[in-house]
């Protein structure tokens, strides 16, 4: 290190300089001293890294005071093999002892493999991707729940190990990190049963080429015409036409054949070649024709006597309808008033319950929400009471 030091005498003021004779001594010459000093030891260079913040990412405040970023909560599912250690973890969670003295910790060796320590035992674990997303909820009063996170990964503890580094001995493939099942029994092999496989690019290109070919043929055609045909209607029409042909042939055979009551063999031979459905349809059609002929033959003699009886019945029915209308209106009013009273009683009990929840709530947001519900239900209660007055018994 070089140190430079300059020492100079301050010149006198102007008045004294003018009073000094020209024959006086010359002004002094400044002296310069240079001192060199060797460094005591190597000096370390300090490098300070500052993260570049992207606008809009994280907690980006314009305040002058330094503020910490908000915490981002990330959750995974821990699955242990059944046994004493699994029950130990379950009881620790129920008693809220995790992180407060319970002998439980998790240490990740890499991005996918980890070590789970439970009650003095080590387990090898791997982090797998679930086939679906699971919502995690939390509650402060065991009444209202709030969504906390979306879970898409699970840490599976497989077997016990003696040392932490033993988990790195097993080589896993990329397919081992894709979990094929869900969390519940109905979601077993869900990736193969419910998720459709991705269509290859060759199939998509083949379909696009076929569409282009058909469009090119349409452009080269002199005239085109199209017609929309419903497949269900087409199948229905074909089945109706087939049944009509079968019934026509069957009825022609019935009319052209004489059946003797004493000779039952002729009847059995005729129906041997028919299906049960065709036979039932033919019998039903014959019965309909017979009943229609019978109604036509008996309707003519009764027509004259029924005209006078029908007029008397119509008059009696009109009188009964007028009486029933008055009774129906009274019954409807009573029924409506009963329903309104039941709704009012339920609404009053709900208002009391909400007011009690508002008094017991410690969170101001929940308390304001309960009070807003109370105000809404009070307004609805007043409206229902006016409806009860408008419909007296």
UniProtKB/Swiss-Prot annotation:
Molecular function GO terms recorded: RNA polymerase II general transcription initiation factor activity
Query: Per the record, GO CC terms?
Result: cytosol; nucleus; transcription factor TFIID complex
Which residues are reported to carry the modification Phosphoserine?
308, 310
> InterPro entries in the record, alphabetically?
TAF7, TAFII55_prot_cons_reg
Q: Which domain of life is it from?
A: Eukaryota
Major place of residence: nucleus
Q: Where is this region: Disordered?
A: 1-43, 253-273, 290-340
A single Pfam family, by name? TAFII55_N
Question: Which keywords appear in this protein's UniProt record, sorted alphabetically?
Answer: mRNA transport, Nucleus, Phosphoprotein, Transcription, Transcription regulation, Transport
Which subcellular locations apply to this protein?
Nucleus
Q: Where is the composition biased (Acidic residues)?
A: 308-330
Membrane-spanning residues: none
**One example of a Gene Ontology biological process annotation:** RNA polymerase II preinitiation complex assembly
Compositional bias, Basic and acidic residues, is annotated for 292-305, 331-340
Function of this protein? Answer: TAFs are components of the transcription factor IID (TFIID) complex that are essential for mediating regulation of RNA polymerase transcription. Also involved in the transport of mRNA from the nucleus to the cytoplasm.
Complex and partners: TFIID is composed of TATA binding protein (TBP) and a number of TBP-associated factors (TAFs).
The family classification in the record reads:
Belongs to the TAF7 family.
In its UniProt entry, what is this protein called? Transcription initiation factor TFIID subunit 7
- Organism field: Schizosaccharomyces pombe (strain 972 / ATCC 24843) (Fission yeast)
